[in-house]
Swiss-Prot record:
Coiled-coil spans in chain: none
Source organism per UniProt: Arthroderma benhamiae (strain ATCC MYA-4681 / CBS 112371)
Origin superkingdom: Eukaryota
UniProt: L-glutamate binding residues: 120, 413, 434, 465-466
Subcellular location as annotated: Secreted
Signal peptide interval: 1-25
Glycosylated residue positions: 111, 135, 262, 272, 350, 370, 547
GO molecular function terms listed in the Swiss-Prot or TrEMBL record: glutathione hydrolase activity; leukotriene C4 gamma-glutamyl transferase activity; leukotriene-C(4) hydrolase
Protein name per Swiss-Prot or TrEMBL: Glutathione hydrolase proenzyme
Amino acid sequence: MAPAAMNLLCTVLYLLSSFAQVSDAAPWLFSRSIPASYHDGRLGAVASENSMCSEYGADMLKIGGNAADAVCIYRLSLFFAFLPYPALQEDRAMYHSGIGGGGFMLIRAPNGTYEFIDFRETAPAAAFQDMFKNNTSGSTSGGLASGVPGEVRGLEYLHKNYGKLPWKTVMEPAIRTARDGFRVTEDLSRIMLHSTKNGNFLAENAAWALDFAPQGTLLKVGDIITRRRYGDTLDKIAKYGADAFYTGPMAQAMVNALRAANGTMTLEDLKNYTVVSRPTAQIEYRGMTVTSTTAPSSGVVLLSILKLLNGYKNFFRMDPGPLSTHRMDEAIRFGYGQRTELGDPLFFSNLTDYQKKMISDEAANKNRMNISDEYTQDIAVYDPKGLESLNTPGTSHISTADRSGMAVSLTTTINLYFGSRVIVPETGIIMNNEMDDFSVPGRSNSFGYKPSPSNFIRPGKRPLSSICPTIITRPDGSLYFVSGAAGGSQIITGTLQSVINVMDRKMNVRQALKAPRLHDQLVPNVALMEDEFDKKTVDFMISRKHNVTREKSGSTVESIMRLKNGVFEASGEPRLANSGGVVV
């Protein structure tokens, strides 16, 4: 991968954290003065939840940038343009992402090689298996809820291995934007009100109020919000590197804030954090190569579902709806049943073999043989151990690609809105509540299913995630499709159906994302179907004994397709008013 490209990718992830409007750091970006030279759709594409931000990403491609550059500009412009609804991503960074969190990234270099970068949060050294057994709220709010953040070390890894520009140069746009501020949108105002309905911590806690209620009441639509402390924090990281975050005064302030909220994270926890470059996973589907990510993400779950469905040769062709929808749901149920055994590979010696088995011909054939076209079956058929499938929330996704064949599928998070609701007073860093993604022994979920031992808390362990960035190539190795989603446990089914809709149903990208979605994570034993499904399909599913509930999809998908002639198609999430994809 080109060093300049990775430098710009580093920039975007810091920009994710700034939660601020672009200032005169890059005035050309918003002037719309990019030359209106002719572009034939072969230069590249950006798909995001905001059409204007996608336009700015496309501008970067017009002036000679690449897919990573487009990611950068998208994230930069998103901070002032739009806030999506709850299921959707990081909402302006501070809601579901930032340097107090972590994530996963799948990168396809122009030469066709892949890298899966895991900068997921880890459990502190003092964490233990039963720490939330009698403290149910402790995993979502307060100091114990935070895992050791991985984002800054992840960016350091990218910069040192691929970077060329000076670290400070990479950081400068994010610093400027954090200090300048932006106008509160209707969406931001709505989310602030939603998050404070059971206690106005944004106004009543002085550390939060400095940004959100500087005059004593929550900022309203049209007001200017700034994050100057955060800008100063990024400035220090720019000058002194990632060690400024993980050691010294900044790290001490983080530890102090968490300990004041009953946390146990230490300076050693921060100092010892490392990112992991993990193997990718691949299968053949309809003659093409599908690449995704391995545990502790859920790319291998997506691949196992596709592997099973690959055995249905007339899937969504001879039968355009009902039976294929039933078969898809059954495959999804097997996939989520397999997911309950996943966890951090560092803590399981046989997890590599298990994942290989998940996407093997043998497993796919066996599970397909166990599917009945006449009815769905008891949960034990799909998950014999009766383990829970966590409803993990949060996340943000963007897909980009360019004419060189480079593509980036990126998802990050700090988990719930405002993470653990711990903000570091001195730095403005919002801490994650990723510890809630672990399973807790002895705490069966509300449906009576047991927690998964594979995802129990251990010191240094990374919790299981639903994230599954995906890239597909043709038999000749050329780029075909880039996709991913936000929406917690619905990420897998959202991404899956984007793939099925373009590859099996022969839809274009916009049609693929607009088509009604189904979600079934096995536990609870409910098939969620959007209202747009036709009555024939819904009635068929009910006749097959599925517990159908009509509900709007909780996933938001962003995808890009590259046609054989090199022309790109792109789409943001159609369920969002301002989402969009842009090709140039």
